[in-house]
Amino acid sequence: MARPRGGRWLLGVLLALCRLAAPLAKSLEPVSWSAGNPKFMSGKGLVIYPEIGDKLDIICPKAEPSKPYDYYKLYLVKKDQADACSTVMDPNVLVTCNRPEQEIRFTIKFQEFSPNYMGLEFKRQQDYFITSTSNGTLDGLENREGGVCQTRSMKIVMKVGQDPNAVIPEQLTTSRPSKEADNTVKIVTQSPRHKVPTVEEPGKPGSVNQNGQETQGPSDGFLSSKVAVFAAIGAGCVIFILIIIFLVVLLIKIRKRHRKHTQQRAAALSLSTLASPKCSGNAGSEPSDIIIPLRTTENNYCPHYEKVSGDYGHPVYIVQEMPPQSPANIYYKV
């Protein structure tokens, strides 16, 4: 009993050491999405440097009694869209700030592989952009151009797995998460009094758009998967056609071989029938006549003739007199 306990203890120590050796994920400082946030720098927005495994919370603050509530719709966009402050083409909604009575919290987890098919996935050394083209009013919630992205530089630039002290050239390869819409990321709303988290349902105002992150725009992963599917279908069709052709050729060869064998067998039977002596009469010949058949068979035996000699050449038979009958075969008289 002591050995199993010692083995479990050693295994627990090894697991603890592995956890300590692995890089610890951290939660980044939450970002309050409001026009009064001084972190949004003019012309640049907010630049952060997350690592794989980190988490980021974007907070839509609750309305203050003395100030009007700001309505925003946040999008995950490409670099050219963030620079132009336009979400006309391929809009991808992350969260909608439209609940003045409560705080809305949107959590992003930076992960390379998501357990959810529709989850967000990020790659190292790439940039991702979040912005809003709403103007802060309820009527301007659905604006697709300009908005606070242009007037207040309200955008977040996420440089995943990059060093903030490194000198990075201007031309960078930017892309969106390779998977489509984010089902794993939850929008948790809290009431300051009760602190009861609730997950918003898709389709309602203020929830994440579940239709997909790259619904209309080109996606390398999606296109590669479609090409692979079509290639597999084409290869399957070609293999199926080749199998059908092979079976047809094999069937034709088998039928030809069977037909040839049947013809040879029929010809052998006809020659054997012509050469075999039948139990027929002498058709008017004398008792001493000698008949040499075309072919003899050892198995056939007729009681009215007797084999005299067959050691050299054709066998010789002495035919006895029988009543005249119609001959069935042809014989040569010697």
Curated annotation (Swiss-Prot):
Subunit architecture: Binds to the receptor tyrosine kinase EPHB2. Interacts with GRIP1 and GRIP2.
Compartment(s) where it occurs, according to its Swiss-Prot or TrEMBL record: Membrane
Segments on the Cytoplasmic face: 253-334
Spans annotated as Disordered: 175-218
Species this protein is from: Gallus gallus
Motif PDZ-binding positions after renumbering to this chain: 332-334
PROSITE patterns cross-referenced by the UniProt entry: EPHRIN_RBD_1, EPHRIN_RBD_2
Residues carrying sugar: N135
Domain Ephrin RBD: from-to ranges: 26-160
Signal sequence bounds: 1-25
Topological domain spans for side Extracellular: 26-231
Main localization of the protein described in the UniProt heading: membrane
Record field: compositional bias (Polar residues): 207-218
This protein's UniProt keywords: Developmental protein, Differentiation, Disulfide bond, Glycoprotein, Membrane, Neurogenesis, Phosphoprotein, Signal, Transmembrane, Transmembrane helix
Protein's GO biological process: axon guidance; ephrin receptor signaling pathway
Disulfide bonds: C60-C97, C85-C149
GO CC annotation: cytosol; glutamatergic synapse; plasma membrane; presynaptic membrane
Modification comment: Inducible phosphorylation of tyrosine residues in the cytoplasmic domain.
Protein known as: Ephrin-B1
GO molecular function list: ephrin receptor binding
Keyword Transmembrane: yes
Purpose: Cell surface transmembrane ligand for Eph receptors, a family of receptor tyrosine kinases which are crucial for migration, repulsion and adhesion during neuronal, vascular and epithelial development. Binds promiscuously Eph receptors residing on adjacent cells, leading to contact-dependent bidirectional signaling into neighboring cells. The signaling pathway downstream of the receptor is referred to as forward signaling while the signaling pathway downstream of the ephrin ligand is referred to as reverse signaling.
PANTHER family the record matches: EPHRIN, EPHRIN-B1
Record's keyword annotation contains Translocase: no
CDD domains: Ephrin-B_Ectodomain
Recorded topology in the membrane: Single-pass type I membrane protein
TM helices/strands, residue ranges: 232-252
